[in-house]
Structures are given as C-alpha cells and as structure tokens.
Amino acid sequence: MNNLNVLNIAGYKFEPLDELDVLIPKFQNKCDALDLRGSVYLSPNGINFSLAGSEEAIEQYLIFMEEDPRFLDIPLKKTYSETQPFRRMKVRLKKEIISLGRDDINPRELTGEYISPQELYAMYENNEDVIVLDTRNEYETRVGLFENAVDLQLDTFRDFPQAIEELPEEYKEKQIVMYCTGGIRCEKASAVMLKAGFSNVKQLEGGVLDYFKETGGKYWNGDCFVFDERVALDTNLKETEYIYCFICREPLSAEEKASPDFKINEYCPYCIKK
C-alpha cells in the first residue's frame, strides 16, 4: 500500500516583481485556505517556494499562482512523503530569493550554460575532463555529494564568492559543472564565477533532485539534504534515516545517532562541546 499522500513541490523564477505588499498577503491567504505548509519567498527579483499538501491543494495553488503571467513556466520539483514535512506556512518578503549579498549578480542578465542530468551522467560515463563543483553548505555535502566533486566547505552561500578565489588558477580554463539541490544557487554562483574569470562554467539544470529523477542517481555518494523535516532523500527520492539534532539542527546519520556523543533532545556530536 502506498502511503505517500503528501505532495511536495519546489520552484523558483527570477522575475522583476512589484506590488509586493499586495502579493504577500494574497499568497499567505491562499496557502492558508488550502491548508498548505512550507515557504514562499517573494522579492523584487523573483519568487522561491517550497510547499507541501494534498495533490488537490497543490493543484489549486498552481492555478492561483499561474493566474499571474509573471509566474508562468516555473519548472517544479515534485516528491511525495507520508507526512507533512513542514511545521507552518510562511510567506515572506526577501531582499533576494536566494541570499548571496551581491547586488551586481542578476541571473536574468548573466548565468552559466545549463546541462541536463543526462549530459552530466554521460560526462561521468565517458570519464570526461571536468571539474564537478558543489555550491552547497558543508552540512549538506556531509550528507552526500557527487563522485569526485570539489567541496568548498561553505558555512553559508554568501561565502561562495570568497571560496572560489582560493581555487587553483588552472580551473579558470577548465570545464566546470556546478550543482546544488534544486538549481537556484547555481543561477547566481555560475554568474559569480563567470565574472571572476572562469571561462567555461555550466550548471546542472534542475539540480540534484532532477538528476536523481532522470538518471537514478548513479555517481552520487550518500543521500541529498533537503530543507524540511524529511532532512534527506535517497536516490529514489525517498526519506532516509537522517534526523535533525533538536538542539543545533545539524543533520544526523544513523551512525551519529548511535554515537555516545548523542542524547536525544540534549546534544549531538556537533554541539556536545559547544
């Protein structure tokens, strides 16, 4: 019996928006009426949302959203879960729909070339000379990452511009394929690299989640961190054994939960000494 009754969707679009003071309560009221949970971030440069609810409610949300032509043609990431992975519904005004802290970066004007999941898969199969670059945070890469990927060990995405300055100079002439969970960070990260003089920068279209869906996840080691109470998904897009530490919110594997440095609701290996 399939108990995966909750539909999870995520999407984003870089699009100039005005009248945000009207849009925010409009989105909040609609999501509340549909009993959806998750987040919708609106900014002068676009929308970024992650929502969960019944299939009917999600369908009604999409009809509502697409009544505004600015929100048409948004590619969606869809997964299913047994339970609601979000605690509340929030619609927020943001300066940026993904925070980088660089006013000069606009993906509508400059961003890296997209490559499909199948193209990245073929690069691995053919052992191509390519630098696979992870743009996610350290607590995400610890859960899983692509085979031979360069991990920048970021604390936050805002650290990305500084981190690439420390990459080997020869990378500027190499073919680079970057990736993140769903694609939004790479829209900006690829522009940062192009402006910094990296000549051949591509981004994985749809991110890791689309790679799992389209290829089955070969060449991925581990699971993929997601920003909700499921914590991580495996290559079949199913929930895993990862949990959050109740105190510090670090993702914890089964092995870390078995550590003597873990006590439920009190401490974990990452916060016991803090």
Task: List PLM regions with ranges.
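Internal catalytic-core helix/loop-beta-alpha segment
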Residues: 110-126
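Rhodanese-like catalytic fold shared by cysteine-dependent sulfurtransferases
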Residues: 2-113, 137-175, 184-274
